[in-house]
Amino acid sequence: MFNKILLATDGSDHSIRATEKAIALASCQKNGSIEVVYVIDGKQSKDDVLQHWGTDAAIHRKKKLLLIEQKIKHAKINYTIHYLHGEPGPMIVKHANEHQFDAVVIGSRGLNTLQEMVLGSVSHKVAKRVKCPVMIVK
């Protein structure tokens, strides 16, 4: 049922929990696979470059995904990693809808009601606009 799973991640603890759920879903299928997507937000990318001035920003991003990649490898699930550029919510939605995934798994930061109203929630934006089932992991 869920052969092709998109795992939207930012390398956070919430993403690690989402990874575990994506692995569980993919493991239920003989040919289950996970596509890990990390969106490089222009604003955030600028902050990363300034903060990691002496290091390569690409290496810093890969380190963020290292534990996620190790967990998927350990589970012996086929996977790919894609880096997208833009605003996370719309980019995840666009990628998911264009590539016809069976499910999207994404972590939630657990914003309170006020924060969610002011800032918006990437996970809720994705859930509203993606054309396949979405699992939001707390």
Tell what function each PLM region has:
Residues 26, 68-72, 96:
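Conserved hydrophobic residues forming the short capping helix/wall of the S-adenosyl-L-methionine
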Residues 35-37, 80-84, 135:
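General small-molecule cofactor/ligand-binding pocket signal
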Residues 53-63:
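A short acidic, glycine-rich active-site loop
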Residues 95-138:
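Gly/Ser-rich helix-loop-strand patches that form or flank binding pockets
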